Amino acid sequence: LRLSRGLGDVYKRQFIYTLILKPRTNQNIVIGGAAGAAPVLIGWAATGTELDTGSWLLFLLVFLWTPAHFWALSIENVEDYRGAEFPMLPTQESKKRTSIFIGVYSCATVITSLLIAPVLQLGLIYLFLALIFGIYLMIKSYGLYSNKIKPISYFVFSNTYLAVIFLSMIADILFTIRNT
């Protein structure tokens, strides 16, 4: 029941996002990020566990990661978005200004990833990888701002970053279980 209600909520949000928000505001990705992050809460709730600080931090991680990730892709494909008349941030702001937004969201994403460690009682494996990959995400963000890398480079690495964050949580938990 929780799962079906949660999936219904995601579809409703995606419908509202796709038909109402996406064609009308350059902040569509920020607003749509909630629907993209909702599966974290649905998965957590599906285990029968109450939503707590840990679940909301994981939601926040994906929510904050989403805009920077997609804005980089939008910079890469800005002419396609202009042609489709979608008001993505890069179609209405300069690449430099969009890169500043990407940097702010990247920083918030990295901080959130580090806050997760004590809340979920994760150990050194997670903390080390979150720190190293977080620093590199910030370096990529600065590289985008200073025109030293192409937007697609940030986009591709941000996929790797999020995958490593979640995989390192699993590795850390499995390592802890094995050594107890």
Positions of predicted regions on the chain:
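Solvent-exposed interhelical
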Residues: L64-L114, L120
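Membrane-helix interface "capping/anchor" motifs
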Residues: L19-I29, S146
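Transmembrane alpha-helical segments that form the membrane-embedded catalytic/substrate-channel core
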Residues: K12-T18, L60-V78, V110, F133-L144
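Small-residue-rich segments of transmembrane alpha-helices in multi-pass membrane proteins
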Residues: V30-T47, F155-M169
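Interfacial loop-to-transmembrane junctions
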Residues: M138-V164
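Single conserved hydrophobic/aromatic residue that forms the stacking wall/gate
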Residues: L1-Y11
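Helix-coil boundary and interhelical linker segments in multi-pass alpha-helical membrane proteins
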Residues: R5, V40-V62, T112-I125, I170-T180
